Amino acid sequence: MRLFQNIWHNMANNKNRKQKRQKPKPDKCAFQVAIENTEEVKDGFCIGKQAIKGNDRNKVNAADNNKLQGSLDIDSQVKALYPNSSRWDYALSYNDKIYFFEIHPAETSEIENVVKKVKWLKCWLKTKATEIDKLPKSEHPYIWVQSGRYAILPTTKEMRKLTMSGITTANKLSLG
């Protein structure tokens, strides 16, 4: 009986020591909470740039990585739900501001496709991702990041469509 009591006592002490050693979980940022409250992407939050696919990660530069709160691969999360839709790629939170960016070939012939994608994104945010939509956005929240060379003629009617849709273009997404 005494042996059993000693074993039980040691197990209880080990459990208490483990609980004391565990690091406290960091507070969740508003972006993470909003994602977790959005049914279609509830498991999609990743710390830092981890949700961004390998080569695409090089297209995002943060001046201060401590302000980079998290990312969401929208396309991968909702692909099964909207297989035939023109889905937007990513959302990212930096310094409590949300950036939505699409990595895509930057050619005049692709403007219509990217405009369709941003229309889909705005509709999805308003109807399915209202918690994410409520978050503060960057000054220019919809960014088309070129995946290769830049071949968009600045004076075309397609370029005006891009501007009217609120999309800005960039070689890289520069944060901060």
Language model feature labels by segment:
Residues 72-80, 100-101, 105, 132:
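N-terminal low-complexity, charged segments
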Residues 90-92, 96-107:
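Conserved catalytic cores of phosphodiester-cleaving nucleases, focusing on short active-site segments
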Residues 123-136:
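Arginine/glycine-rich "motif VI" loop of SF2 helicases in the C-terminal RecA-like domain
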